[in-house]
């Protein structure tokens, strides 16, 4: 099976306090914290050189629908601009809530009400918009092998 969560626009629309907090945020994304986590350091460094960290807005606008979509996932390591005078305790470089907020946002994709679950069969075709969804491949096929072909369509990037 595969699951996709649609950009979590519904969460963004409903949670006014969260919406105000995350609107200006940017986040760091790294392949190292997922695929590279269990690799020897040499392979991890080579992977990171091939796929360097990137920084993106946490809330992006879909170029065709105008919908606000969240861009946080398992590759998101931290917010890069959460430290402000309003949310850092005096005299300490400690940001309360940043870790919990990131866990909350990434955890929303695991809620079944925000997902479409696709059961693959021979000849199945599924299409989703990577600019507004997150994909998860359930590990429900062993001892069989998972074989699929994936194609990407070049389009307008989300801004």
Description of each model-found segment:
Residues 36-88:
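A mid-sequence, solvent-exposed acidic-amphipathic segment
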